[in-house]
Regions:
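Catalytic-core regions built around general acid/base machinery
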Residues: 33-44
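Surface-exposed cleft-lining segments at the edges of enzyme active sites
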Residues: 19-27
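Asp-based, Mg2+/Mn2+-dependent phosphohydrolase catalytic module
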Residues: 39, 50-154
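Short secondary-structure boundary/capping elements
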Residues: 29-33, 83
Length: 154
């Protein structure tokens, strides 16, 4: 998906550059509030990731984030990229939960809009205090960080 994104943006790149970038993405650590908030949420909810990343990249990243998820899902399972409705539908099927029972949490408006269009609820993590925008679908919740999300959902 990194290669696809760079090509769509018209950014010239080599295979080595893509490999380096993916290796850096795999090593990303969560924000400091995330691990404790996820543990709190884990007590009441199933936790899953739906990512535009490739399955191999997501598996490699698992070692670096240290958070136990019930499911780590690549959009490759749906054959499309977010925000295509098929990605959200496939994730719901994998998790085994109805679309309207899912709260999709994201820090990108397009993820929230896609989830809402697919029939999910959405929470927007607004760390940068920026307006959500005048999208046709708005999130059900807007919170500053995962700590606030966990507090509101507990």
């Amino acid at each position: 998906s990194v290669d696809y994104t760079l090509e769509r943006a018209g950014i010239a790149h080599t295979a080595e550059e893509v490999n380096w970038l993916v290796a850096q993405i795999e090593k990303l650590k969560p924000f400091p509030d995330v691990p404790a908030a996820m543990e709190k949420l884990r007590k009441r909810y199933k936790l899953a990731i739906l990512s535009n990343g490739d399955p191999d990249m997501l598996e490699a990243a698992r070692a670096h984030h240290g958070i136990a998820f019930d499911h780590i899902i690549s959009v490759a399972a749906a054959g499309a990229f977010k925000p295509h409705v098929a990605t959200y539908t496939k994730a719901a099927q994998i998790v085994g939960v109805a679309m309207n029972e899912i709260l999709f949490v994201a820090n990108h408006a397009f993820d929230c809009v896609g989830a809402k269009a697919a029939g999910m609820k959405a929470a927007f993590i607004d760390r940068r205090k920026r307006p959500f925008g005048k999208w046709p679908y708005q999130p059900d919740m807007i919170v500053a960080d995962f700590a606030e999300l966990a507090e509101q959902l507990s």
